From Swiss-Prot:
The lineage of its organism: Bacteria, Bacillati, Actinomycetota, Actinomycetes, Mycobacteriales. Belongs to the disproportionating enzyme family. It catalyses: Transfers a segment of a (1->4)-alpha-D-glucan to a new position in an acceptor, which may be glucose or a (1->4)-alpha-D-glucan. The gene is malQ. Disulfide bonds: none annotated. It comes from the Bacteria. It is found in: Cytoplasm. The keyword Transcription does not apply. The keyword Repressor does not apply. This is 4-alpha-glucanotransferase. Its main location: cytoplasm. Its EC number is 2.4.1.25.
Length: 724
């Protein structure tokens, strides 16, 4: 590879773009010039020529000196924090704080700063340093600067140094089900699992088996077709939503909406449900489009029913709470029904929330916009009800929300938040052991510079929404709050690079919002991770994630040796498997290798991969025998092996244990195969039993296998831990 120009290397360094990285095999990889130029362009920095790079370096320096205050100051409670101000050289600088509660504090102390002044277009700018006191309360405050006739203000965010676990989990462990909600149909749902099903699953697992939470797939909003069907088929992946702040109306239970009782012709709603249920019974995959077509028709009928005065007040309060973001989301949904679901192809007057034609469209389509606002209100009420029921049933946490990494590039958030999302690149992951071609998630990443300029408000709102009706949140690929793999448009995932984020700021804001909500934060920290990152998460009191198949003893013994239970992390959520692998029964049989081989995803010979899978299985069976969870001699059947593996989890010190619902009922089919789109029915696989026959929610409640596994994990989490 051609040596990179020093100016390009320096420019990349200033903007947090890696010029080299260590891959999953430990090999040092140099990033190409084309990738660096594309990443800089996504940050608004032209860097194709030497002149452009030199101009950009000069502009970056000038921008630093022209800014009176930092864009945002994020600090930890109990620590003094120093920051710099820029004023005309020699001019006084009066600095004070205004706290979130309106209180003013003046004890912002100036300290020595001997930096020489800077000539900014003939005006000499001086730099002074100030220190914020260590005793500031948690919250969102402001620091103000006055110098002569000039004034400036910046956000100060004081975050918890340590989040940890809430009092309700003090000294205790908890177990819960990990569920892909869409796959869990009931006899009352509309061909797809919904929020009433979620509430009932929580009630059963808590009251019958002492579960402390239900971890559910991201419930984020998807792009849904309108009456004219202008949109493409519904994107099945819950990890590629149109919006992460708002919720998917597919998860509504129509019959749980209070106004339904006042609908004059309720028989039509019943017929719609019956028809879609019969259609679903004939398929071996989830048909979201048919489910939504029926549900949308019913919801339109209910939306027209007059509401009581009290209900109108509740709706108005919801709209006030959600503000401009709700209006933008509902507007995008109505626009997508009219012009299609790719806002880049809309008329130019509609391609931005503030564009000239948007307000006129809203006026002319007020009912369509209100329908989508109303749907979010109903979702908010049903989510609140599910969480309330879970807690009343005895759960310590209730619903554990799942926050996806990003959003669809053509969707609502990409339209509404386009000023803080990078254009011309997508987020993904470099090659690793299980995805050797890398991954492109087709999502525009946050721009770290714009997040700071906007005081992290879009990110704050996202975390607040995730925790509003949840006792915990799992953040998918939490490593993306430290650095994220950016892939230039049109390039393969192997041709990306890492871009740094202010992890102190982003993790701090997550911790602050979780502290205010009394919630737990679980970071999915699998894959290629810098060694210090897991230590940092632990020091901030966030839980990590451990998957049994990935927990290997890399310090002692040969490769592939299982990590002994007592050496697992305490501050983590542990499970046997994940949605990107087959359920445990399938994994034990080597299904993950055969599936990837059939899809052309292997980079090694299939026999070598199968032999590796057999060796992994043998190593874990030997470990289970070593600790007495399997008897010597006869080979265990699938159910016995799965039960023993989850009992092994119970011997780890992990504070949270997760049981995949697919494992509880003996399912074998993979929910998602990374590296594929239409080649495999990702996120469209309904829950089935070991015989491959569909399993409804009501069947789970009486299933012997599910009860046995639940009780085994319950016993493990309630027994004394010798390693504590």
């Amino acid at each position: 590879m051609t040596e990179l120009a020093p100016s390009l290397v320096e420019l990349a360094r200033r903007f947090g773009i890696a010029t080299e990285y260590t891959d999953w095999t430990g090999r040092q990889v140099l990033v190409s010039e084309a990738t660096l130029v594309a990443a800089l362009a996504a940050l608004g920095v032209p860097a194709q020529t030497e002149q452009q790079r030199n101009d950009a370096l000069a502009a970056q320096l000038r921008s630093y000196w022209a800014r009176p205050l930092p864009a945002t100051i994020v600090m930890r409670a109990g620590e003094q924090t120093q920051f710099r101000v820029h004023v005309t050289d020699g001019a006084p600088a009066d600095v004070w704080l205004q706290l979130e509660d309106g209180t003013t504090r003046a004890e912002v102390v100036q300290v020595d700063n001997f930096t020489p002044p800077f000539d900014l277009d003939g005006r000499w700018i001086g730099e002074a340093s100030f220190v914020l006191p260590a005793d500031l309360p948690l919250g969102y405050h402001r620091v103000n600067l006055r110098s002569g006739d000039s004034q400036a203000s910046a956000a100060v965010v004081v975050t918890p140094d340590w989040l940890g676990l809430p009092d309700k989990l003090a000294g205790r462990r908890a177990w819960g089900l990990a569920v892909q909600l869409y796959s869990v149909r009931s006899r009352q749902s509309w061909g797809i699992g919904d929020l009433t099903d979620l509430a009932n699953l929580a009630l059963w697992s808590a009251s019958a088996h002492g579960a402390g939470y239900v971890l559910v797939n991201p419930l984020h909003a998807a792009t849904l077709p309108g009456p004219a069907g202008r949109s493409k088929p519904i994107e099945p992946s819950p990890y590629l939503p149109t919006s992460r702040r708002f919720v998917n109306p597919l998860y509504l239970r129509v019959e749980a909406i209070p106004e339904l009782v006042d609908l004059p012709k309720r028989g039509r709603v019943q017929r719609l449900r019956t028809n879609v249920q019969q259609h679903a019974d004939q398929l071996d995959t989830i048909d979201r489009d048919s489910a939504w077509a029926a549900k949308r028709a019913a919801l339109k009928l209910v939306h027209r029913v007059p509401r009581s005065a009290g209900r109108e007040l509740a709706y108005a309060a919801f709209r006030t709470r959600e503000g401009r973001a709700l209006d933008d989301f509902a507007t995008w949904c109505a626009l997508a029904e009219t012009y299609g679901d790719d806002w880049h192809r809309w008329p130019k007057s509609l391609r931005h929330p503030d564009a000239s034609g948007v307000a006129d469209f809203v006026d002319k389509h007020a009912d369509a916009v209100d329908f989508h606002r109303w749907l979010q209100w109903q979702l908010d009420e049903q989510l609140a009800s599910a969480q309330s029921q879970a807690l009343r049933a005895g759960m310590s946490l209730g619903i554990m929300a799942d926050l996806a990494v990003g959003v669809h590039p053509n969707g609502a958030d990409a339209w509404a938040l386009q000023d803080v999302l990078a254009q011309g690149v997508t987020a993904g992951a470099p090659p690793d052991e299980f995805n050797q071609l890398g991954q492109d998630w087709s999502q525009p990443p946050w721009r770290p510079d714009r997040l700071a300029e906007q005081e992290y408000r879009p990110f704050r709102a996202l975390i607040q929404a995730a925790l509003r009706h949840a006792g915990a949140v799992r953040i998918d690929h939490i490593i993306g709050l430290f650095r994220l793999w950016w892939i230039p448009d049109g390039a393969p995932p192997t041709q990306g690079t890492y871009v740094r984020y202010d992890h102190d700021a982003m993790i701090g804001i997550v911790a602050l919002e979780a502290h205010r909500a009394g919630a737990v934060v679980v970071g999915e920290d699998l894959g290629t991770v810098e060694p210090w990152v897991r230590d940092y998460l632990l020091l901030r009191g966030l839980l990590g994630t451990s998957i049994l198949w990935f927990e290997q003893d890399r310090d002692c013994g040969p490769a592939g040796t299982p990590l002994p239970a007592e050496r697992w992390r305490e501050y983590c959520l542990s499970s046997v498997t994940t949605h990107d692998l087959p359920p445990t029964a399938g994994y034990l049989a080597g299904d993950q290798v055969r599936l990837r081989e059939s899809l052309g995803l292997l980079t090694n010979p299939v026999e070598a991969e199968l032999e590796s899978a057999r060796a992994d299985r043998a190593a874990w069976m030997a470990e289970l025998r070593r600790v007495g969870l399997l008897a010597d001699g006869a080979e265990p059947d699938s159910e016995e092996a799965v039960l023993a593996l989850y009992r092994y989890l119970g011997r780890t010190p992990s504070r949270l244990l997760a049981v995949a619902l697919t494992d509880a009922v003996g399912d074998r089919r993979t929910q998602n195969q990374p590296g594929t789109t239409d080649e495999y029915p990702n996120w469209r696989v309904p829950l089935t039993g070991p015989d491959g026959q569909p399993m409804l929610l009501e069947d789970i409640f009486t299933d012997r296998r599910a009860a046995t596994l639940a009780e085994a994990v319950r016993a493990a989490t309630t027994s004394p831990m010798s390693c504590w």
